[in-house]
């Protein structure tokens, strides 16, 4: 999955998001899912990766774990740049397959990043989550690549340090109240909601105004 951080916060989606087939009216991050992960299935010639995946069964079905299914994880282990499972299990992988799959992984990532960027300029890319292990070389769409400590468990860390926030919306008539005054009032309402939810008053700041 690929997202964009703006001022330290995920960029919000401007389209309706469906969760389990249900249309929602929530603020949701703008995320592009490209169907590429450690368990993604790789074709015999290496030219097609995903979107099918062995998912959590990677540790039993992937070649490096003693299974019989060629996955993206097997490809990066075969390059010799990543140590996961038993590399001897992919020693017989054809070089053409490994090279084709490595190129396809890079192509998918670069295409996804280009689609999400607000401009054509390269941006820093932060690699987190289990799928980050698939990125073993520089990406053309990235100005730099950052791999934080404990990046593999970023989801758990994010859940543990999630920030408390408040949100307020109101329809106003600028004939009755100036815009700036209306914004200030709604901002105060949002801050009050954040404080009521347990936010620290010393660290409150406005994340976004529409």
What do the predicted segments below correspond to?
Residues 3-210:
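Helical "lid/coupling" subdomains associated with nucleotide-phosphate turnover
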């Amino acid at each position: 999955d690929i997202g964009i951080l703006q001022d330290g916060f995920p960029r919000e989606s401007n389209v309706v998001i469906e969760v389990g087939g249900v249309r929602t009216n929530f603020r949701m991050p703008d995320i592009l899912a490209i169907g590429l992960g450690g368990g993604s299935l790789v074709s015999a010639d290496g030219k097609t990766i995903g979107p099918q995946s062995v998912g959590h069964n990677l540790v039993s079905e992937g070649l490096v774990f003693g299974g019989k299914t060629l996955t993206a994880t097997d490809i990066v282990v075969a390059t010799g740049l990543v140590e996961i499972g038993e590399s001897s299990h992919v020693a017989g992988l054809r070089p053409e397959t490994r090279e084709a799959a490595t190129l396809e992984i890079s192509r998918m990532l670069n295409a996804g990043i280009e689609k999400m960027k607000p401009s054509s300029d390269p941006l820093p890319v932060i690699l987190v989550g289990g799928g980050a292990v698939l990125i073993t070389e520089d990406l053309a769409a990235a100005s730099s690549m950052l791999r934080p400590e404990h990046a593999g468990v970023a989801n758990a860390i994010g859940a543990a340090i999630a920030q408390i926030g408040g949100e307020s919306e109101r329809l106003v008539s600028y004939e009755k109240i100036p815009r700036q005054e209306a914004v200030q009032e709604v901002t105060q309402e949002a801050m009050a909601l954040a404080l009521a939810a347990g936010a620290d008053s010393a660290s409150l700041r406005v994340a976004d105004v529409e």
